Structure formats: structure tokens, C-alpha cells
Amino acid sequence: MKVTTKSGFKCDINENITKDWRLTVAIAEAQKDDPQVRITAAIDMVRLILGDNEQAFYKHLESKNPDHIVSEQDITDDLKSIIDKIKNLKN
């Protein structure tokens, strides 16, 4: 499945990721109140969803930021845009 994130990052992701229990758990963990749990869940989601595209994703986000940093907010926004597309695929 081809996706384009909110920031404009384009990549292919495995459509079968919707069947991976680890992603379901990570999405649920991302809703918890504990910030450390949420961060760990975001890391897991990036790795599960993007796989080999993870470093290219970070480089893309870095290039979009004037300070050349990868912000937590940018990661969160892009993950949300991908997850929304995945949810639409499941429905």
C-alpha cells in the first residue's frame, strides 16, 4: 500500500500490517496516560509500519525542520496520518 504522510513522506507499507497484533498493542499503548509508555508505543509503531523506511522517514522529517531535528510532534502527526489510512483499509 502506498502512503503519503501529513509531512509529505511517501513510502510503501505492507497491507498485512493491519493483521499484526503488535501494531494493535502499540496503538492501544499510545493512548495511555504514561508519557514513557506512549513514546515506546510510537517507536514500536514506526518500526512496525515503516520497517526499512524508518531512517528515510527520519531524514525526511529532519529536512522539513529549520533546526534539522525530528520532533515528537512531527512523528506523532505522521503516524496518525498513516494509522488513519490503515484503519480505512481495515473497514
Which residue ranges define each predicted feature?
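Short, surface-exposed, charged amphipathic helix/loop patches that serve as local interaction elements
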Residues: 17-91
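Short, isolated positions in well-ordered beta-strands
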Residues: 10-13
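Short acidic-hydrophobic surface loop/beta-edge motif
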Residues: 1-8
